[in-house]
Design a protein with these regions (language model features):
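Start-transfer (signal-anchor) and selected internal transmembrane alpha helices
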Residues: 1-13
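Interfacial juxtamembrane loops and adjacent helix segments
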Residues: 30-106
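Juxtamembrane segments of multi-pass membrane glycosylation machinery
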Residues: 109, 116-134
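Membrane-interface micro-motifs in multi-pass membrane enzymes
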Residues: 111-112, 164-198, 202-206, 223-225
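Hydrophobic, membrane-inserted alpha-helices
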Residues: 115-118, 139-144, 161-169, 210-217
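Transmembrane-helix motifs of polytopic, lipid-linked glycan transferases
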Residues: 135-156
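Membrane-interfacial loop-to-transmembrane alpha-helix junctions, especially the N-terminal start
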Residues: 150-160, 199-211
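Membrane-interface alpha helices of multi-pass inner-membrane proteins
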Residues: 206-226
Length: 226
């Protein structure tokens, strides 16, 4: 039901906002700066999946309604058998009214819950600004976890949580639409446990708590199978 509602949002402004920054977000070859950090960043970024997520957010077939879009998740690609999401998104942005040279696919095996926030955000901001906004949210959540852990005299939790982050390609997680979803959910879960550990432990609610976290991860994370 929620996906149907977001598919009722106008895609015109979303497409224009994506077009503003698609060149900056999908650099290749000579477009990548020569410094070592930029080369590392662009070589390891999850642009393949991010491009699919963004294009899913701005797709709209004139002969399909919101329910059909939410159910089947239509997606145009330049290739019929091998997906080329970065090039396909660029081509789609250049001429989204003319898709005669593209192949229509369906991507129905995932929940695509990320569209609940990605579509409204792209309605208001460019793709680049959405990434910066997610970066700010992640930094704010990490600071919140650190402060709460110190106040609860449980600094070890903060140390372990933030320490583990260093082993997860931290820079890439912070600027990736794909990777940031699980990290944000993890930080929210840790924060909730810090605030409500006694109640969760005394009432034996941890199994249900982790079940809810798993459900949310499966729903919002693009790469988690239902």
């Amino acid at each position: 039901m929620l996906l149907i509602l977001v598919f009722l949002l106008p895609v015109g402004p979303m497409r224009r906002n994506v077009e503003k920054s698609v060149g900056d977000m999908l650099k290749t070859g000579d477009e990548i700066p020569e410094d070592a950090f930029s080369k590392y960043l662009w070589k390891n970024r999850e642009t393949y999946t991010d491009a699919i997520m963004v294009q899913n957010a701005i797709e709209r077939l004139p002969d399909k309604n919101a329910y059909e879009h939410a159910m089947w998740m239509y997606h145009y690609d330049l290739e019929e058998d091998v997906w080329t999401p970065e090039d396909s998104l660029k081509a789609f942005c250049e001429s989204h009214e003319n898709v005669n040279d593209m192949y229509l696919h369906i991507y129905a095996r995932y929940w695509h819950g990320y569209l609940l926030y990605l579509k409204p955000l792209l309605l208001l901001f460019s793709w680049k600004h959405v990434v910066w906004l997610e970066l700010a949210v992640q930094i704010a959540l990490m600071i919140w976890v650190l402060i709460t852990a110190i106040r609860k005299q449980n600094a070890g939790v903060a140390a372990v949580t933030l320490g583990s982050f260093l082993f997860m390609k931290p820079v890439l997680v912070l600027i990736s639409l794909t990777m940031s979803v699980c990290w944000i959910l993890t930080l929210l879960a840790v924060e909730y446990m810090l605030l409500h550990h006694d109640r969760l432990h005394e009432k034996g609610q941890y199994p249900e708590f982790f079940l809810i976290i798993g459900i949310l991860t499966s729903y919002f994370d693009f790469l988690t199978y239902p």
